[in-house]
């Protein structure tokens, strides 16, 4: 059972259970035993649940799954958001809408995974609970803030795990852990019962070993709830079906550096060039071209919106409690204080900066179908690189290489994915980042499946 998910993805395991080649209880018990063993070295799972109800008869019937400690609630359990201040948060009285859909799809929720405090850092090293370790090398971070899910999936403890993304937090850990991770379009998966996150920048989905698992899970969880502020356009068919057809000849643009950013490490430039060549060999039209927008203004707007949301979310969740010394990590405290001071004028101008950038990206995608880069502007992420201390400017400088390619997708709501088809000379995964126009997840899934066939990654494991 230890190697079950090294050999089978989630859909395959569900089929084995459905055809009685494996028992659901056998899979659950064996998986839990393996997760406990792996977690001793990875520190990826914060809480194990032993009260999972019987699995529903859905496409993932009987497959164990984990939920990140952020942006999602599980009935009967607290959501800590990776913070000491919320360690004793009241238990949720109901599942979030997306979690309820996951259960209806047959997933068995067996625990919660680690995150940075409030998801503010693109790493997973919270003071509350401690750092999660990248299974590829124990001095490296798996990235974040969905690093708990990414680490346990990369270690083959599970075939996929829940992840959220407010600036890259699905794609960054997917890139650093050799996984597939797609951030859906704004409004594709409901965030109910909350209204929105980060002025529409927040999204949720999963990190996975296979492309088809991600697509099938999006089929199961996509769709709006009554009153949702956003709703993505309906796809032409199922996302799983998109993985079974050729993507056609796509117009692919690639960049060698972030918009407004510094030159990349030559290792990353070579990875981009190799991927561009592969895409040409697969029949796509490839050229070097970059969208044009004010990256500095977007970054400033992002931090203002994040700060305001952090302050408000602390107040809403605290229910009158006031954080004392040490209750919040230093950077979280500074971000919250900055958020409290932001004016309505500053906030509205920041939202307008999001929309200006969205229009610029929309114009770019009139001429191109896909934008290619690396997922992050680093080759790896040693533990301790993105510390939650010092000034906010210093923290921003530490974060910038991690989100240089990813955050714009959150600000504009477009779908994007990290695909593990490149590797460094020392054998570490390099995620390649692909962005498409709003609502075009089908394009990304068709391309991802083509790349998965051309450059298989499943057997490359820690």
Segments predicted by a language model, with ranges:
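Short helix-loop capping/hinge segments that flank enzyme active sites or metal/cofactor-binding pockets
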Residues: 60-84, 244-256, 305-362, 374-378, ...
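A short helix-breaking turn/cap at a secondary-structure junction
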Residues: 183-270, 274-275, 293, 454-462
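Residue-level signal for inorganic ion chemistry
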Residues: 31, 214, 252, 279, ...
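Short glycine/serine-rich loop segments
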Residues: 94-226, 410-411, 415-431
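Short, gly/Ser/Thr-rich active-site loops of penicillin-recognizing serine hydrolases
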Residues: 345, 444-462
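Acyltransferase
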Residues: 24-29, 96, 238-241, 264-291, ...
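Short, well-ordered alpha-helical
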Residues: 1-91, 119-121, 239, 243, ...
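Short, surface-exposed loop/helix-turn segments at secondary-structure junctions
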Residues: 84, 231, 305, 349, ...
